[in-house]
Amino acid sequence: KDIEQATGILSGSIYYHFKKKEEIRNILFQETAAKIVEEVSRYADCSNPYQAFMLNNFFTWYKIFHNIKYRRFFLESPIGNASLDYYIDNFYGFKKILSPEVAEKIHFSRMDLALCYGVDSGLGSYIIENYDEYTKTHDYIYTSERELTLYATILKINPEIYRSELN
């Protein structure tokens, strides 16, 4: 009935094509994910693979966190909210060891930190996949400062640049 109300299509017609709600959900998720990847890919055209990864991940999570349905799914569940609280506590503890030049640029709202949390969730896998090459020239503090500077720069951009397609 929920699907019928949301789409205006009779449930008999829907279930003629889809036997279970899960099939509909899977198709919708795949289509939504494909749209997000398509929109985000234009921001990730960078010569630096790390920055390209971070931008791609950033804008993907931005889209997720600014869509109320996705935000509820990821952050308003007890586990997601507890994970975010833990991340924020660690973030402010970590901020104390950053260089003063970087630390003074970092002023994030809870939503901004939620976005950073999502981006960071993919950072570990990126570094692991590129560990040998990455560790030749980077260390954890360098990586974190660079990442936080990137976040601060993007979050100060005129919101229309990355919010125009969200409405």
Q: For each of these PLM feature ranges, what is it?
A:
Residues 37, 41, 120-128, 132:
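Regular secondary-structure segments
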Residues 65-113, 125-132:
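Short secondary-structure transition hinges
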Residues 46-75, 141-152:
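Amphipathic alpha-helical segments that line or abut small-molecule/effector binding pockets
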Residues 96-100, 129-167:
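C-terminal peripheral helix-coil segments that are non-catalytic and often amphipathic
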Residues 51-55, 59, 82-85, 89, ...:
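Short, well-structured alpha-helical interface segments that form or flank functional binding sites
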Residues 107-127, 138-141, 148-151:
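A conserved mid-domain beta-alpha-beta active-site/ligand-binding segment of alpha/beta enzyme cores
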Residues 1-23, 27:
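Helix-turn-helix
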Residues 6, 23-45, 55, 59-62:
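Alpha-helical structural segments
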